[in-house]
Amino acid sequence: MADLEKILERLGISPEKRCQVIKKEQVVRNMEKIFLGRDLSNRLLYTLACIAPKNADLGLLADLVDARVIKHESMLKECLRYTEKKDVSMEEMTRFVKRNEVSSEDVRKFVAKMRSDRVAKKDMVSKARKAMPCADFRVVVEEINKVPDDVDGGDEKRPLEGGWLEEGEIKKLPKPSEIPQINEEIRQAHLRRTGGRVVTRFPPEPNGILHIGHAKAINLNFEYAKKFGGYTYLRYDDTNPKNEEAEYFDSIYEDVRWLGFEPYKVTASSDYFDKMTEFGFQLIRKGKAYVCHLSQDEICERRRQYVSDGTNDRSHLSQYRDRPVSENLRLFQEMVDGKWEEGKACLRFKMDTDTKNPLMLDLVGIRILDVVHPRKNVKYTVYPTYEFALCVSDSLEDVTHSFCTREFYTRQESYNWLLVQLEIYKPIQWEFSRLNISNTVLSKRKLLPLKKYGIELDDPRLFTIKGMRRRGFPPEAINQFCRSLGFTFAETTVDVKKLENFVRDNLNRTSRRIMCVKEPLKVTIMNSTPCSISIPDLPGSSVVRDVPFTPVIYIEKSDFMEKGDKDFLRLTPEQPVGLYMLYPIRVVKVTPDGIVAERWDGVPRKFIHWVSEDSVEVEMRMYSSLWTSFSPKDATYLEEMNKDSLKVFHGLCDKRISDARIEDRFQFQRIGYFCVDKDTTKENIVVNLTIPLKNIA
């Protein structure tokens, strides 16, 4: 038995698994036969011992494994099935193996075919196993893991790459060459400039940081252009400098790149202010714009009266509407020259007021603002409005598909009207529903008041891009979530659990495992000596790291119960427990200083994690939802905040966390997924709970 235990240890079998193996008489007998005179380090021989039925020809199969004819478990299982029904020779078995071998190239081709056949990733493994039972399963899994994820931790589907853009109304959008234009000359000139490629833009206003809703728009714009071989601008809508700050320009660019997207070019509406001023003069000359001296409040009141009177008397909109063109040109030039004060004059569009659309009631196109532009560091005399800048910037950048959220639908008419009057290229507009997510708020108007509670915009409890990044959400998971939603006109609220499923699934596959105890309980093991054990970074990973073991360890306080009950499966004075990757222990006595235990040779009911005496202290910030209600109400969302959404523990981690860097992600076994916070220093590692495990043992 001692020799067998050494063989198992040499094969890298974990201590708890060794305890189980030596209790299985059939496996022990198989191992004694198989390893006699053969390579004791061959893990496949151990597999044969574990899976071989009683009547198997162990000698023949072991010889084939030892000779490296059978090289992996899948082929071994097929050989076992083949030999079940008849006696075969070494030569026949060798021919069987050669005949059924599946190369890595064959696996790659089969996975590629499944992708082209639109097989969901969750179904690929079973299909591959059925079609290629003799293929090396590790190679199959490696190839399938290269496929973009299409299934989360539950049953919700993620489309294959590009597939999410081929469903619903979005797949009906016209090609660049099919987009209606004022005339064919404009269309052909545009196609020459772009080469007929799709051009999109993501146009955020630099007055705050991005959130999960923006991530959906970013994915749409960048991925739609990519699908058709096009490109995407990142364009700052910087037409409202009083609400904008220089820091947000850099912050937005950083967030877009962190999500994995690289803009074709970074621009701003302000890059085209001079051109928009020229267009202002052009519209005046066409009789489509005039200088107005009404205040903003007066303009709103005049519009209200115009709609309520129902007389269609356009002079109600402004007494300045019918000024002569020459006077409008002179006054607008005075505005440009800085001769008018803020609020004393603006340029309004002379629009088609027969429509019922309130955004066609002579919009303000250019106004005077007494402020220095935060990006240009220039004090412009006149500033175009959002309504003017959006469509003109889209046209000047040859944007083919202008994507906006549904609330901008009413702006479509004014957008097209302006481009027609200017006789320039006209993109197609397409609206989609805004992303609302449960148990949170997203608007800047609601987020800024949180500062008085000590909650900044990058707080891990918020669903801003920076908040999610700090919490440890992988950008790939955020993108997959956004692409899973599809596009509809109906506005709904998505359960945050859907996003969490994507995050958990990603972290389960990618995050290094660490042992950590949140509330340490000291255990002294009497009959033990210091040693070092090798633990893989991930289950099945070839990358292993050494973890020191000392006679004094710490376990989770909740893993011990002085007076246990029948449902408690971990350590009690009467019930031993196994230590992960080590051996079982049992309690000798309980003292004020902790537990005194000793090594035990039995088979425990449960294994628990632990850390050694020289472990690393970490500050654990255990976050939960900032709002417990599914949809926080506008009027009471501050009162609805969860006052217990952050709890701080000072836990102990094994030595593997010593080299952690900010934003590194880990799975703390049996606790959850964590991310190293930016507050970390050399003296103090701070980690944020990203998301709990689905089932905490």
UniProtKB/Swiss-Prot annotation:
InterPro entries: aa-tRNA-synth_I_CS, Gln-tRNA-synth, Gln/Glu-tRNA_Ligase, Glu/Gln-tRNA-synth, Glu/Gln-tRNA-synth_Ib_cat-dom, Glu/Gln-tRNA-synth_Ib_codon-bd, Rbsml_bL25/Gln-tRNA_synth_N, Ribosomal_bL25/Gln-tRNA_synth
EC number: 6.1.1.18
Motif ('HIGH' region): 204-214
Catalytic activity, reaction form: tRNA(Gln) + L-glutamine + ATP = L-glutaminyl-tRNA(Gln) + AMP + diphosphate
Keyword Lyase among UniProt keywords: no
Binding locations of L-glutamine: D237, Y386
Broadest EC class assigned to this enzyme: ligase
GO biological process, one term: glutaminyl-tRNA aminoacylation
Annotated CDD domains: GlnRS_core
Key word Zinc present: no
GO MF entries: ATP binding; glutamine-tRNA ligase activity
GO cellular component: cytosol
Keywords tagged on the record: Aminoacyl-tRNA synthetase, ATP-binding, Ligase, Nucleotide-binding, Protein biosynthesis
Motif 'KMSKS' region: positions: 441-445
Binding residues annotated for ATP, in chain numbering: 205-207, 211-217, 405, 434-435, 442-444
Domain of life, source organism: Eukaryota
Protein family according to the UniProt entry: Belongs to the class-I aminoacyl-tRNA synthetase family.
Identification of the protein by name: Probable glutamine--tRNA ligase
